[in-house]
């Protein structure tokens, strides 16, 4: 009898797991793959070229529907798992419980949203997945002004892509120079000048106090009452491990779900 393997999350990690199992033990597992997104595995690293128009979604698909079907994987895309019942060894999803013998949690990370007034207004998005990218592309078709909060790599890629699509872009960064985790001040200065030559306005040592608007976003309030008009606000201020399922299942959790050298959780 095959081992019932349930995998939560259809990102690059779980994709590599399935590839390895197909290579080493193709008949050993009956695999069910859940993903909160309504699609399978694609290369998130390449979302920025999709935003800028250099690539399309089809170009960055890692495993398409035919690949999953050919390998006998049952796909439950667009259906997030809401609960893990460790005692009964089932996962609870929208359509009901699914039993498992082995469970792999590969939920990845979620974007961090700064806790300011107006963060939930329409027109305020994070930059994490294809839906976020498509929302930015749709906004850019209308033109207007975009404010990107965060001057790290992801934020600058968002800014460059939106500028490439014709938006007037400002970057708001809390620290003294851009990409401070990767660059020293001198290199950050050169990067800033390059972005400014592309028409992107940079605000460093700038703290977001609130996001303004009534029915949708209209601007970003910085310190000293400076307001940047905005038709679109993109938050790119980092990520946090997605651990809520593990916490709810009373697995050991620290900065992420705690595992040993064999990637086994506290419920091996």
Residue ranges of predicted features:
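Beta1-alpha1 glycine-rich phosphate/pyrophosphate-binding loop at the start
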Residues: 1-74, 161-183
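Short hydrophobic core segments
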Residues: 8, 81, 98-108, 228-238
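Residue-level detector of alpha-helix initiation sites
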Residues: 12-16, 38, 109-111, 131, ...
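Rossmann-like dinucleotide-binding cores of NAD(P)H-dependent redox enzymes
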Residues: 61, 145, 155-212
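A conserved short coil-to-beta-strand element within the FAD-binding core of flavoproteins
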Residues: 77-89, 204-216
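Glycine-centered tight beta-turn/hairpin loop motif at sheet-sheet or coil-to-beta transitions
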Residues: 93-96, 223-225
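Glycine-rich dinucleotide-binding loop and its adjacent helix/turn
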Residues: 107-165, 259
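FAD-site-proximal beta/loop scaffold in flavoenzymes
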Residues: 120-143, 215-221, 227-268
